[in-house]
Every structure is written in structure tokens, then in C-alpha cells.
Amino acid sequence: MKIFKIFLLCLFLCFMQSCGESGIETIIPENEQENNPSDSHEGQNGTPSDDDTKSKTLKILAIGNSFTEDGIAYLPSLVRNAGIKNVTIAKMVIGGTSLLSHHTHAIKDDSVYNFSISKDGSFKSQGKKKFSDCLLSDTWDYVILQQVSQHSGLYRTYQPYLNNLINIIHSYYPQAIIGWQMTWAYSSTSSHTGFKNYDNNQTIMYESILDAVNQMKTETGITVIIPTGIVIQELRGTNINNYFELTRDGYHLDYGAGRYAAACTWFETLIRPIFQIGIKGNTLRANSGNVPVTDEVALLCQEIAENVVKKYYGNKEN
């Protein structure tokens, strides 16, 4: 009887330990666009202590369109889940806007940007703002740009607007590091009218994007590249790929695995080098989209994002 009681006690203790170690945080969306993550910070491999991170800060401003929103939708939640503090992530976006249009709005300085800021794990709208309002709202470490998707593989559409935007941004903050989100190719069956720029061929579009970004790096000196497009293309070769090829409409990213993988890529590129903690082991999940982020899907997205970023930067911290 005594041995039996000891056995029951051991079972009970094991059960309590397993309950305390699960630490899975799941995003339960109010709808497919707005998400309300919980506040669990458990389960992240190598989570830094408050003493490790309280002296470090990072401020990221993303300028773009709906592809920008796809890229960073889950980034604040991933950062919070990792137990990382003192990170400000902001986005100033206009749907379907190209570098040419951003340059025009920067010159006119009209109140057309949908501006949102996250300091605690979720974006909060600041309403319509001018280009200058957004830039002057904080002292940004990184300002991330991108081209509109249909022109992302056509470098001739980047200039002179990209160089002009860089000069304008540096007139506000000379020390800001300019970065670039490499966007993704459309699905093979995409109906986007801009797909004709690439003969309605995903491979041609993908390779054109790679070529354009390489030319941009050479001509502008931009070295901080967020290789979202490579990560999405790699995932399309795995068993989680679907008819829409990780998009929700042939071009915007799926609300589940697509957006999650993109945010993992941003995390590995910008967050890891500063805070010395990677995405691998992050317990954030997303029960949305055509490819929900289960434990298996999350691990795959994390591993591919980590590997792609390491390979892109030659296994060095960017």
C-alpha cells in the first residue's frame, strides 16, 4: 500500500509539472484581420531575463502597403511571447502604394497614412497621419521599405524614388538604418493583373524579385534585407503548401502560416541580432487562415525562417 501511494504521488507531481510547462500562446482572432493574443510568455527557448534586456531598445518603422501589414502582423506578438521588452514596432501604410506614390506623399506631406504603433504586443491605430508625423513620432533605429508587389521584380520602377525616399528619411534621422522587405511571388494561379509583368509565371516573378533586390543592394548600399519572399517560396516546397500557395487570394499572405512565417523572418532579421534570442521555440500560434499555425506548422515556419536568414547573411549576424 505504501508503495502504491508513492506511485500515485509521483504521477500527480508529473502531471502538475507538465501543466506548468506547456506555455502555448494562441492567437484567437476577433476576425481575420485583428488578433488578440494572450499574455503568456512561457515556453520560449532562451528567453532573456529583465536584466538582460532592460537596457536594450529597438524601434522599427515599416513604410509600405498591405504586404507590409502581412509581413509584420504577428511580429509584436512574437516579440512579446519571447519575453522581449522595449521594442516599438510601427507601420505607416496605404494599400497598393508604390515607391513612386510614397515619394509623392512624402513631398506633399498629406494626411494619408494609416499609422499604427505597437509597444506592448499589439498594434494600436493612431489614425491618418502625414509622412512627417510618422517619422517624427519617435527616433527610429530601422526604417523598412518595400516596392508594390507587381513592380517588386522590376528594378527600373524603384528609382529614382527609392534614393529620394532614403534622402528624405535621413533628413529626419541621419542615423536610421534603411532596410528592405523582399516580398514574395504570387501563387501560380493568381488573378492579379500585375502578374502579367512576369508572364503569369511564379518562377519568373520570384527570380525577378531576387535579381531586383540584388541590384538594389549594389546601387543603394542597403544591406538589411528581410528575405520574406525566400521563406515563403521555401515553404511552398513543403507539405503545408496548399492550392493558394500560402496566400489568401493569390497574392496577399494566408492569415495563418503565411503571415506567421513572414513575421518569423522579420524576427530573425531584426530582433535576434539585438536581443540574441531566435524565433525557434516561440510558442505563439494562430488559429486562422487556410493553414492554421499548429505546433508542427509553427516549428516548420520557425526553422525555415531561421535557416533562410542565416544562409542569406552567410551564417553571420546581420
Provide a role label for each language-model segment.
Residues 1-5:
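Positively charged n-region of N-terminal signal peptides that target proteins for export
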Residues 7-17:
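Bacterial N-terminal signal peptides
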Residues 15-54:
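Bacterial Sec-dependent N-terminal signal peptides
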Residues 57-61, 88:
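Residues that mark the start of a beta-strand
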Residues 61-63, 92, 181:
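Short hydrophobic segments within beta-strands
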Residues 70-158:
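Conserved SGNH/GDSL esterase-like catalytic core that processes O-acyl groups on lipids
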Residues 128-256, 268:
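Alpha-helical cap/lid subdomain in secreted, periplasmic
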Residues 250-253, 257-318:
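Conserved catalytic region of serine esterases and O-acyltransferases that act on ester linkages
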